[in-house]
């Protein structure tokens, strides 16, 4: 599904921006549930992202090529060592002696600037898949359909939620 969406974005860009050198990279945020890799008792959201990316300025991509990019990027980044390194980087910045004594309002402003430079704005869309949802048998007869809607971030306005229930996948 991620590859199909990336291909569609490339085709839209090709229509809207005929000059290849003016096209932008196509990057999708794919959330990864870290609870499956790292046991945690927290009830907070414990996730990171895998970010498959292609650059249309380098030429046209076939659907198979995009599928390979997504497949290999997922395999590379969705690894406990790689995710552990991302977590360690975040934790190390929190433990910095300078940042620990810095007033919160300054930290918040700095984090906003950093997030704007490297956060979700650097992607085209976020594709989040809850997977197959199972309901208790007593509840199932009362449910006709299951949907998953992602909140719209301030900078990256395109999101897609996917959920499967009762043999049907809703996008």
Give a label for each model feature:
Residues 1-5:
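Short amphipathic alpha-helical segments
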Residues 10-170:
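Acyl-thioester-dependent acyl-group transfer interface
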